[in-house]
Amino acid sequence: MAALRPGSRALRRLLCRSFSGGGGVRLARERPTDHRDAASSRVSRFCPPRQSCHDWIGPPDKCSNLRPVHFHIPENESPLEQRLRELRQETQEWNQQFWAKQNLSFNKEKEEFIYSRLQAKGAGLRTESGQRATLDAEEMADFYKDFLSKNFQKHMRYNRDWYKRNFAITFFMGKVVLERMWSKLRQKKTSS
């Protein structure tokens, strides 16, 4: 690939820094929260250290199973960078809400399906050994097929909106990269 040639390292570094928000992304362990961060985080109670200068990826959310990202806000953030960060945050919150609702609905309907099938068989919710009764894979396949069929339109709307949001984010990322490159070129011209 042409982008991986040794001569293009500077461009790769610049692009990587631009797309990651200035320096990188850190994976994080779950930490106790402060009151200051609990109010600002609607997605997770996880909070990165105050002095952090990177985006942090938190532990998976219990409802949505998605890992929330806590975006670093640089001191000299331009209006375009701020708009990009806000768009990414809005998209993350939208995504978290959709999957939390979807997973709740899925689990509720799955339990109802299992209960109704066990009742139809005349079996109880527990086996003779006291373990929770389950259905085999073929029986569960009926549920999965029905669930996907019932939610087909919802998933199509989600995918369409997801692609629109990602296109907008990618567009803003490109604008931010260009803005940063122009500002670096202007700095070089004024310093020479």
Swiss-Prot record:
Induction description: In conditions of increased oxidative stress, the protein is stabilized, increasing its mature intramitochondrial form and thereby protecting COX from oxidatively induced degradation.
Places the protein is found: Mitochondrion inner membrane
Key words, A-Z: Apoptosis, Membrane, Mitochondrion, Mitochondrion inner membrane, Transit peptide, Ubl conjugation
Transit peptide: 1-26
Main localization category: mitochondrion
Keyword Mitochondrion tagged: yes
GO biological process: intrinsic apoptotic signaling pathway; mitochondrial cytochrome c oxidase assembly; positive regulation of cytochrome-c oxidase activity; protein stabilization; response to reactive oxygen species
GO cellular component, one term: matrix side of mitochondrial inner membrane
Post-translational modification: N-terminal mitochondrial targeting sequence is cleaved from the mature protein once in the mitochondrion. In normal conditions, the cytoplasmic precursor protein is rapidly degraded by the ubiquitination-proteasome system (UPS). Oxidative stress induces protein stabilization and import into mitochondria where it protects COX from degradation.
InterPro entries named among the record's database cross-references: COA8
Superkingdom field: Eukaryota
Disruption phenotype: Mutant mice generated by CRISPR-Cas9-mediated gene editing are born at the expected Mendelian rate. They show impaired motor skills, with decreased motor coordination and endurance. Mutant show global COX deficiency with reduced enzymatic activity, low steady-state levels of structural subunits and defective assembly in all the tested tissues.
Membrane-related topology note: Peripheral membrane protein
Pfam families: COA8
Tissue expression notes: Expressed in atherosclerotic smooth muscle cells (at protein level). Expressed in aorta, brain, heart, kidney, liver, lung and spleen. Isoform 1 is strongly expressed in Kidney. Isoform 2 is strongly expressed in brain.
Entry function: Required for cytochrome c complex (COX) IV assembly and function Protects COX assembly from oxidation-induced degradation, COX being the terminal component of the mitochondrial respiratory chain.
Family: Belongs to the COA8 family.
Record protein name field: Cytochrome c oxidase assembly factor 8
